[in-house]
Structure formats: structure tokens, C-alpha cells
Amino acid sequence: MRTTLMTISIFLTTICQLSAQSGNAVILIQPYLQDATPHSIKISWETTFGEESVVEYGITPKLGKKARGIAFDVNFSSSRIHEVEITDLERFTEYYYRVRTGKTVSDIFQFKTPPFASDNKSFNMIAMSDMQIDHNNPNKWSEVVNDGVLQYLKKEMKGKLPDNLALVLLPGDLVENGTNYKQWKKDFFNPAERLFSQVPVYPVLGNHEKNSTFYFKYFSLPENGTPAYAEHWWYKDYGNTRVIGLDSNEGFRDLKQQYDWLEKVLDDTAKNADIDFVFAQLHHPHKSELWIPGEEKSSGKVVELLEDFSTKSGKPSVHFFGHTHGYSRGQSKDHKHLWVNVASAGGAIDNWGEFEGRDYDEFTVTQDEHGFVMVEVDADPVDPKFTIKRISRGNSNVARDNEMTDSITIWKRERKPKIPEIKSLKNETVDSMGVMLKAGKFTSNATGAFHAASHWQVSDSEDFSTLAFESWKQFENWYYLEDRQKNDDLTDEKTNRLKANTDYFWRVRYRDQNLNWTGWSEVGTFKTMD
């Protein structure tokens, strides 16, 4: 009897499925764009059933061309993910398109192909992370995309979305549980369909993806990483910028293959005259002011490689990250390298004081708020630069509607300020309990440059091979809702207690807000008393 009932159940289920499929397929996930080049792009979507995968496209809404692709299973049901690659496109050209599966047809959308680096076209990108659902605020990801990104671009730049935004970077934690099939549609793709249907999206894995098969089925990323670890790490060029995606998750973050690959890519990038900037993205922070338990030591290896690359090549770099649910922006002391936490685009905020935190020297701004990061790349062939802007959506205590709460501009070319003049301790004898170092005002020939950091060193050796005192202070340090550097003009610094009856040497250098250091000042000398 049990066997008979099971047979009847299977038969009825099959009949229901066939009956459902006798109608038109339903688009579960609207078309989204991936892996764009000047001459090609990949378009994916998901339907309730159906094997036909067709994209109709053209340079006008009349379309006129067709490309066919593949369909494949996603969750052992009739649902199908469709993927079509169009390969006959012209560079830096706007196209219209729609997708078709059987009689089911999407709306018409638009996209724009990337330029060649030699076209010297400026562009914008968005970076944001940790949009996994907050069950106490389940619509936050939709708000960040639709009221945040899309409204910000509409207000600030006018025109069509594909003209104003080239790509979207997502450094992980796209969903709460990557092994839960339903979350991908409901919590991630559907809220962002107006964005992803017109702008290519480039994610990397976060811990919440759990290395899920669904992630690799939904996304088609550049296959230029290590073949055995396809789509775990990769790079993509857009104009004068190289974007590098990395995997900082357990089981992958310590793999020698990833670091060997990254070193080779950076070496090739240093030699590539077309590339001015490198933007890397990985999920886990090396340092986190809001949430120390979220730090990952191995991410420090990536930071060191990027720092070394930037200093040797003269090409500034950034690492975008998430995991900590808030915004932070910092900069390396000795390198033109930025640290930018681009969360949270949906996940519950890591509020000040909620977890163990620390005030790190590198970071000048940390905010426990939702939002996204806008990156504007100026491809001027003579003097390229990029600007990073934090666009905030606030938090439960402070409402913000696309308010810019932080920004920084980095030029590729050096524009060094003038070396500071030391004003104190020239062959003097002083008390060892603490010495006040003083230097002159900041000056620079660069328009708009101002004094943004000072670096002080004291040594008992003339070559500064060993340091008795060192201090690096920046012009602002927003930590726990206050600027801890308020009223510091950066022209003097008091040392710690020094050894008595000792000859010391000291020097200072200044930095502007664009990360350009002066050379070191002349060396001052002093002797401490008994």
C-alpha cells in the first residue's frame, strides 16, 4: 500500500509539474550583467523552467540581433539559470537588450561596454558589502540600492545609469546563508534588479556564502585565476584600472597558490603601461576598529603585497573589504595605499561599543552606519586620479539620505610638499622626562593641498637604524563619534621619557591629504641631562 501511495504521489507531482510547464515560464531573477569586456558581456537570468536561452540586443530599442546560450539546473528542480555571452560588441557603446525563454520575454534594459585603456575614458564604480538580511530591518538592502545608489546617481549625475556607472564591486556576504537557495532570489537579486540589469556586478566570497554551489552557479566571473580554484580569485580591467578579486575565507586564505598568483598579477600590472590604479577586494579585514574579533591575519599578507606594489610601481592601490558592519577609511603610513571598509549595505550594524574595538593609527574615519562607497576614476592620461566618497544612509539613531560623510582623492603622480623646517632642539640640552619637538608650517605648490599628517622620529643613532621614539599623527581621527585629533596642528609632538645623559637625533616629515610625503627634514640634535 505504501509503495502504491508513493507511486500515485510521484505521478500526481509529475502531472502538476507538466501542467505548470504547459504555460509560460516565469522569470524568477531578472537579467543581470557580468564579466564585461570592450567587445563582450555575459547576461544571466533564472526562470521557473525552460531550456531556451536567448538575448535579443542592438544599439536601438528595436534590437535586431540575437545570441544564444545555455541553461542549467540550480536546485534539482525545474528552475533554470540561463547564461548568454554576447561577443560581437563595439567598445564603449550603449546597447539595448532583453532576454527570452520560450514565450517569456523580459523588459528591455540597457548596458554600456567598457572602453580600451587607450581611450582615456573616466568612469565610476560602486563598492558595498555585507548586504545579508537583517531580520530586524529586512528591507535595508533594497533601500541602499534603490533609495541610495540609484537615487544618488540620478540626482548627482543625471543621464542614464549605464553612462554614469561602470561596475559594482561586492566584497562578500551577499546573503545570510549561501546554502539556502531561496535567499539568493528573495534577499539578494530581487532587491537589486534595477541596478544589476544595467551595470555589471563583480562579487567575491564572504563567510556567509559558505563556499556554496549556488554562488558559483549564479556568478560567472573572469577565469584568469588559478585553474584549480576557478572564480575564487580573478582580475578584471576597466580602462586604466585593474580590479582584483580575492578569497579571504577559511580553506582558501592561506593557500600558497593564491599568493603566488597575486604576486604574479601585481608584477605584470607594474609592467603594464595601461594600468594606473589597482583596486583589490576581499571580505575579511586585516584591522577593524569596530570589531576586533572579525580581523584576519592573512589579509595582512594581501595588504603588504599591495603596499609593496604601489611603492615600487608608483601606482596607487586600494583594498576594499567588509565583514565588519560599518565604514572605515585609512591609509598606509609609507605607501599610497588605502584601506576601505565598504559595509554595511544591509546587515545589522556593528555599533560603537557593542564589540571590542581599537583605535588604529591607519584609520582616520570610522562610522557605524549603512551606506556605500562611490569611486570616481579620472583617466586623464597626463595626471590620472581617483576619488573615493562615502555615501551614508545613517543608522537607527541618525538618519542620513545619501549624505557624503567622507572623501579622499589620490593622484598617481607625486606632488610632494616642501620639506618642513625644524624649529627646536638644535644642539640643545634638555630634560629626559619628555621633549617637545617643533617644526615649521606646512607648504606646498599643489593647489588646495593641506597638512594631513606628520611623522616624527627620535634615535640615538645618526642613521636612525634604531628608534627611541616614533609618532605618526593624521589631521583627523574620527573614533567613537569624536575627532581625537581635533585642535592638533601637527607641527609639534612631545616624546615619551628618554634615556638620561644620551645624545639624540630627530627628524620629521609632512604629508598632504592626497598621501604625498615630503622628504625628511634636516636632522636636529639634543642631549638629555642626567
Regions found by a protein language model. Give the residues of each.
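Extended active-site neighborhood of metal-dependent phosphoesterases/phosphodiesterases
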Residues: E94-T113, T179-N272, K297-K312, G326-F363, ...
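Short acidic, glycine-rich surface-loop motifs adjacent to enzyme active sites
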Residues: G172, T269-G294
